[in-house]
Amino acid sequence: LEDEGQKGEAFRHGMRITGTVSSGLGRAHIFMAQKHYQDQFQSLLGTSVWPGTLNLNVSDDDLRSYIALRLKSGIDTLDASSELIEQASSIDVSSLDAHRVRGFLRDGVSFGGATAFIAEFAFGESSVECAVLIPDLTRHYDVVEIISAKFLREHFSLVDGDNVTIELS
């Protein structure tokens, strides 16, 4: 990837966010394996996706950029400071397409919706297509969830603490 902008800031082709790989709760597979979601991911990325997410912790400029995506998605970021939300609202994300992932009911259980942004995941000299997935209901405003056809941890031999970059366009 060419360095066309500051990390965490919008640049002429979109936005770049750098984060630190972290372990999640291990529950994403329950949702990600659902056929209703997989069908939508197939339409979005042209392939089924790995039934799980890769979590990235973000801070500083990268957190502001991620909150700007959350704001575009209509997701409240109640735990963030009003100053941080104000700074995020000044970031221009109008060139980034938000793709709606519809929720559904199955056997009386509600599976919530989400918003996805197409991106490229980069680590070292390699990259793969992915999407930033922002669930309508989430506990963490500073954790970016990434979906991909690849099991990213295995594909890139990632461990907690590795720094990776996603580029949205």
What are the functions of these language-model segments?
Residues 1-9:
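Generic low-complexity, intrinsically disordered segments
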Residues 8-143, 160, 164-166:
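Long, compositionally biased stretches
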Residues 148-155:
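Short alpha-helix capping/helix-loop boundary micro-motifs
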